[in-house]
């Protein structure tokens, strides 16, 4: 079924009348774009969308603030985990190197083995 926003052929295939449902089929892209005036400002001087009521404006501002805070917190967590992991990796490498140095045989053991021959 090939149905898109501007193609009404899918409704006719099902049995409905596309003209009765969605209007005249001769409407093109220009008709859809002419529904909104191009000269209207999209945002007010403070950056909030222009067509909002005062209650909606305060809700929008609070949502934007929540999104900003969550972004900062998530970045803090991501970088904290990254740097903690790097720090633990560096410490584990130094501990492995420390253990490798401790497992070398001492010079006394080598002298004792050579003394037996």
Swiss-Prot record:
Domain of life, per lineage: Eukaryota
Subcellular location: Membrane
GO-annotated cellular components: membrane
InterPro entries per the UniProt record, alphabetical: Reprimo_fam
UniProt KW Membrane keyword: yes
Keyword Mitochondrion applies: no
Keywords: Membrane, Phosphoprotein, Transmembrane, Transmembrane helix
Transmembrane annotation, as ranges: 64-84
Topology relative to the membrane: Single-pass membrane protein
Residues annotated with Phosphoserine modification: 106
Family: Belongs to the reprimo family.
Protein name: Reprimo-like protein
Source species: Mus musculus
